[in-house]
Amino acid sequence: LHAEQNGAEFTLVVAAFLHDIGHFIAEQQQLTGVDEYGHHQHAEIAANWLAEQGFPASVYQPIRYHVLAKRYLMTELSSDELSTASNFTLMQQGGLLSSKEQRSFEHNNYFHQAITLRKYDDLGKPLTSTFLNKKPLTTPWLILIEQVLAENTT
C-alpha cells in the first residue's frame, strides 16, 4: 500500500506486496525454523520461489535483499524505529552489518530497491505485529501480479 501511494515502480509495488510470501511458503512446506514471526530465511525462500514462477528480477531481487537492507539500515537507526518483529528477528538474520559488509551491499545492483522495499515493509508493520496475525489482501493485487508476469514473458 505504501509503495503504491508513493508512486513506486510497478514491480516494486508487487515486490512490496509479495515480500513476505516466504513465511507462508515455509509454513505450508512445514520447514524447520518457523516461529511466531515467520521464518528467518523468508527472503531467500520468497525470491527463489518467485524466480521459479517467472517473476522478473526487479520483483524478486529486492525481496531477496530486503533483510540485508534491514541489517544495513539498523546501523543508522535506533532499535525503537523498527517493529517488535523486526527487532526480534534482526539477531536471527545476522545482526548489524560490518563496515565492509555495508560497502559491499552499497554496490549491489538492487541496493536502492531493497532499501526502499525495507522502508515500505516497516511502514506497513504495527509496532506489535507478528506473522501469525497477518491476513494478506488478495485483490486488486492479483491483477497487478498478472500484469507483471505477463510483461516478463513478452
Where are each of the predicted segments found?
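Divalent metal-dependent catalytic cores for phosphoryl transfer on phosphate-bearing substrates
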Residues: 6-120
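Charged phosphate-binding loop/patch that engages nucleotide di/tri-phosphates or the phosphate backbone
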Residues: 123-154
